[in-house]
Regions:
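A short acidic/small-residue loop/turn micro-motif
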Residues: 146-150
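A short, glycine- and basic residue-enriched loop/turn
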Residues: 4, 19, 34-37, 53
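N-terminal hydrophobic or amphipathic segments with adjacent small-residue motifs
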Residues: 11-18, 36, 113, 132
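Aliphatic-rich helix starts adjacent to a transmembrane/signal segment
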Residues: 29-46
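Alpha-helical interaction segments
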Residues: 19-21, 46, 90-92
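N-terminal single-pass transmembrane signal-anchor helix
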Residues: 2-30
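Extracellular/periplasmic head regions of type IV pilus-like filament subunits
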Residues: 51-130, 134-139, 144, 155-157
């Protein structure tokens, strides 16, 4: 019998099978972790938007709450004005962050007395499972049914 170096085909197939089994277990857990991280980031962004909206309404009391996210943003270096208040980073002010799309809708009044912010996963099941919303009361609600988030939706604990 010859003295051969290396692995046999059976040994290589066993190693590949073990790697595939480990991958089948690890990858779904990784994806769920990423979804949870995106949802946590979305909730933090909603809180930041609420804080910025209140600051905006106090600073520009003649206008009330902002009419859009871009009104609270501004590229760095930023000079504050009612059209670009420099309260949010430019990424969030453009409406996307961590796999979520954000939108702020004002009430159309001057001064504005209410607003609604929504945070929607860009790819449901991949970037997040739940939609979030909040308004001038700063209570964050969520919807995981896909029917849309409203002030009647469950609140976060």
């Amino acid at each position: 019998m010859k003295n051969r170096n290396g692995f046999s085909l059976v040994e290589l197939l066993l190693v590949v099978a073990v790697i595939l089994i480990i991958s089948a277990i690890a990858i779904p857990n990784f994806l769920r972790s990423r979804e949870r991280a995106n949802e946590a980031s979305a909730v933090a962004s909603m809180r930041l938007i609420n804080t910025a909206a209140v600051t905006y309404s106090v600073t520009y009391s003649n206008l009330g709450y902002p009419v859009s996210l871009t009104a609270m943003g501004g590229a760095s270096p930023c000079t504050a004005s009612s059209a670009q208040a420099c309260l949010l980073d430019d990424v969030l002010a453009q409406g996307t962050k961590s796999g979520y799309s954000f939108a702020l809708t004002g009430d159309g009044l001057v001064p504005s007395v209410s607003y609604l912010v929504t945070g929607t996963p860009q790819a449901v099941g991949s970037t997040g499972q739940r939609m979030f919303c909040t308004d001038q009361n700063s209570v964050i609600h969520y919807d995981s049914s896909g029917s849309g988030c409203t002030s009647a939706s469950p609140t976060l604990d």
